[in-house]
């Protein structure tokens, strides 16, 4: 028997009962703040201002557009696709944004859990075989369109979070 481990566990036992859960409003506020931070990061990349998020670009149909009604599940799926696209890009401009999307997805999962929703981890697109060719042929355009559409999607998510979206 490992007495040291047992004593250590028994010593920590009272503290485990005093741990308080983070209020869900705090999680929702953190989610909104992170969305605003990501939008600011996108705005700081100067060339993203040149394309409308609603504009159709041939060959870039796999980049999600705007969705009028977003559930937590749809938000997570959309962010998973954007994260997959951004991590495939050679540009260093998008590394922090991709990391922020991962954190945002984690916060969405906490919000879903608080609503007793089972939110499976979305994996993004089934296949991005065409992405490699698109990035080689027009990496700059892909980055501009992806960031512009991501910005629009994030602004929609921010609005939807105020309406307390469903699962």
Curated annotation (Swiss-Prot):
Q: Which GO terms describe its cellular component?
A: cytosol; extracellular region; extracellular space
Tissue note: Adipose tissue is the main source of leptin. It is also produced by other peripheral tissues such as the skeletal muscle. Expressed by intercalated and striated tracts of submandibular and parotid salivary gland intralobular ducts. Detected by fundic epithelium of the gastric mucosa. Secreted into blood and gastric juice.
Keywords noted in UniProt? Diabetes mellitus, Disease variant, Disulfide bond, Obesity, Secreted, Signal
Keyword Membrane on entry: no
Q: Which SUPFAM superfamilies match?
A: 4-helical cytokines
What does this protein's UniProt record list under function?
A: Key player in the regulation of energy balance and body weight control. Once released into the circulation, has central and peripheral effects by binding LEPR, found in many tissues, which results in the activation of several major signaling pathways. In the hypothalamus, acts as an appetite-regulating factor that induces a decrease in food intake and an increase in energy consumption by inducing anorexinogenic factors and suppressing orexigenic neuropeptides, also regulates bone mass and secretion of hypothalamo-pituitary-adrenal hormones.
Instruction: Please name the disease the record associates with this protein.
Output: Leptin deficiency: A rare disease characterized by low levels of serum leptin, severe hyperphagia and intractable obesity from an early age.
This chain's protein is named Leptin
Q: Which organism is it from?
A: Homo sapiens (Human)
The gene is LEP
């Amino acid at each position: 028997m490992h007495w040291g481990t047992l004593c250590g566990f028994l010593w920590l036992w009272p503290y485990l009962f005093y741990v308080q859960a983070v209020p869900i409003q705090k999680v929702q506020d953190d989610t909104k703040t992170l969305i605003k931070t990501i939008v600011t990061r996108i705005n700081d990349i100067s060339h993203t201002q040149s394309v409308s998020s609603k504009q159709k670009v041939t060959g870039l149909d796999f980049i999600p557009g705007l969705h009028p009604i977003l559930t937590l599940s749809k938000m997570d799926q959309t962010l998973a696709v954007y994260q997959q696209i951004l991590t495939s890009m050679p540009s260093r401009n998008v590394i922090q944004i991709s990391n922020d999307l991962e954190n945002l997805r984690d916060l969405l999962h906490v919000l879903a859990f608080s609503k007793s929703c089972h939110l499976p981890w979305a994996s993004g697109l089934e296949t991005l075989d065409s992405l490699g060719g698109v990035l080689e042929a027009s990496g700059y355009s892909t980055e501009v369109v992806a960031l512009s559409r991501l910005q629009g999607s994030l602004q929609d998510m921010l609005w939807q979070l105020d309406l307390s979206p469903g699962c």
